[in-house]
Amino acid sequence: MAHALVTFRDVTIDFSQKEWECLDTTQRKLYRDVMLENYNNLVSLGYSGSKPDVITLLEQGKEPCVAARDVTGRQYPGLLSRHKTKKLSSEKDIHDISLSKGSKIEKSKTLHLKGSIFRNEWQSKSEFEGQQGLKERSISQKKIIFKKMSTDRKHPSFTLNQRIHNSEKSCDSNLVQHGKIDSDVKHDCKECGSTFNNVYQLTLHQKIHTGEKSCKCEKCGKVFSHSYQLTLHQRFHTGEKPYECQECGKTFILYPQLNRHQKIHTGKKPYMCKKCDKSFFSRLELTQHKRIHTGKKSYECKECGKVFQLVFYFKEHERIHTGKKPYECKECGKAFSVCGQLTRHQKIHTGVKPYECKECGKTFRLSFYLTEHRRTHAGKKPYECKECGKSFNVRGQLNRHKAIHTGIKPFACKVCEKAFSYSGDLRVHSRIHTGEKPYECKECGKAFMLRSVLTEHQRLHTGVKPYECKECGKTFRVRSQISLHKKIHTDVKPYKCVRCGKTFRFGFYLTEHQRIHTGEKPYKCKECGKAFIRRGNLKEHLKIHSGLKPYDCKECGKSFSRRGQFTEHQKIHTGVKPYKCKECGKAFSRSVDLRIHQRIHTGEKPYECKQCGKAFRLNSHLTEHQRIHTGEKPYECKVCRKAFRQYSHLYQHQKTHNVI
């Protein structure tokens, strides 16, 4: 028997206008998925001709029945069958494509659509041998869904439908006999009395009562009523996403998902609201939008009274109150209440960041993060607060800001009763009480309460400093550091001391400065009891007790406990004195030395004694002076036990003993 090339008609299912109108939304969606997948599989097998009209219509989201009679009979080279294509009549059974003797069908599934049966031949491993000495060909791992149906009359699907019309034939009285739709005939469910247009719908409905779910997933045990549902579900386990966007490379499990996504690139919004002329990418978005005009919000939460337009969002919201988190990450065990949150979370483990900013090269895990980031380059802040006019790059920032005006904080901590505007803020806060630090550094094992803090910490190991100052080129690990640094270039010092009039760039500098006037030293050493104005000074002091001197000078080998001391010491070798006095021209290696020197010219004496009112340029001079009032003499001679208020006095005294 001669080999014949398989045409597009061999793998298509046709409907007349009347038949198409009988299908419900789910069945039309199934038809669209199957047809598009058939066509894509044929293309992958070598077809390079023009695209059939029916495929074009399906891709555009239009109804295919108009072009059903125009389906091309064009032949597709590279794919062979053992039978020539035949015109199909309404009274003849549709036959299978039969393969050569060595053919093995690993798996066969049947998809039903209003009584029509789609034969789904999976992974056909066939070897075709031509009559004229052609080499063996193997077609493996190809998924081809054929319109042909097995002639095996014992197949259980024949109980629903034994024959199907060719699309060139209109629906007639024989349609009922074939399991098709006849709008005049109603089928009643004996269990609940529900009425259906056809046997197929009734059969599907009855599975609700019987609980029949014959298709089981071997991976997770989940069961489905139909094989095509199982097929789609299995892609979640395999990770298979056969539909790829040509623009950005993003892949999808279903073709309709790709179709919706592509509208983002084209900018097409074909679904328009007749009330306000607003356009949308999908019909679902339009349907949701219409409820704004109708005011229909049918799903109300009994816990908090919040209302929702869609039951899907309502069910997601309910999980906040119940605490149910059905979506668990297999990598780290973290659970989520929403499937989309799990999908986003999993990208953390893969490390994939497919969305790159063309301006600065920064990459992101999610497309909307990139969209938000782009606004920083464009300077756009589209989200404006109607109360105060403040604008934001990100909608979430605006939502957080609004809580300032409303003052509503519905989420309260059960331990300390502190209230928060957002549940996420409460979750983070609760870690203070529990001590939970879920984000651990793999390099050093240090753990953190916040992921953002871990990200900043990891840059210590990698050395990455992504934030660069455009003025001087200096780079920083943390965004807040560059924000502070930028104020150096502006020379703006908005924070002024009421006592002495000194101004500061940052509020915390002013806070520390005010302790000089108040004498407050909140940071105390547990070893020796010495107290400090600044936390940093205490940290440096603690190194004296530990004996740790991690900063070594490569020039002379001298070690230092403080980085600042080490930096200043290095200037001895380099001789660099970058800080010059504008009054007298004297230069200094440290900026602090220049500031102290400038007090000679200005006459500034910020350190005042509370006992007698005497003022000093240096804090150390005030400390020495206060010993006159207290009588404290901390410097004692080890030879004669005489004590002194100042170290310089002890130094001079020791010369009398020839100690120095």
UniProtKB/Swiss-Prot annotation:
GO terms for cellular component: cytosol; nucleoplasm. There is a cross-link at residue 109 (Glycyl lysine isopeptide (Lys-Gly) (interchain with G-Cter in SUMO2)). InterPro entries: C2H2-ZF_domain, KRAB, KRAB_dom_sf, Znf_C2H2_sf, Znf_C2H2_type. Keywords: DNA-binding, Isopeptide bond, Metal-binding, Nucleus, Repeat, Repressor, Transcription, Transcription regulation, Ubl conjugation, Zinc, Zinc-finger. A zinc finger (C2H2-type) spans 187-209, 215-237, 243-265, 271-293, 299-321, 327-349, 355-377, 383-405, 411-433, 439-461, 467-489, 495-517, 523-545, 551-573, 579-601, 607-629, 635-657. The keyword Zinc-finger applies. Its main location: nucleus. It is found in: Nucleus. It comes from the Eukaryota. GO terms for molecular function: DNA-binding transcription factor activity, RNA polymerase II-specific; mRNA regulatory element binding translation repressor activity; RNA polymerase II cis-regulatory region sequence-specific DNA binding; zinc ion binding. Residues 6-77 form the KRAB domain. GO terms for biological process: negative regulation of DNA-templated transcription. The keyword Cytoplasm does not apply. May act as a transcriptional repressor. PANTHER family: FINGER PUTATIVE TRANSCRIPTION FACTOR FAMILY-RELATED (PTHR24384), ZINC FINGER PROTEIN 519 (PTHR24384:SF235). Belongs to the krueppel C2H2-type zinc-finger protein family. May interact with MVP. This is Zinc finger protein 540.
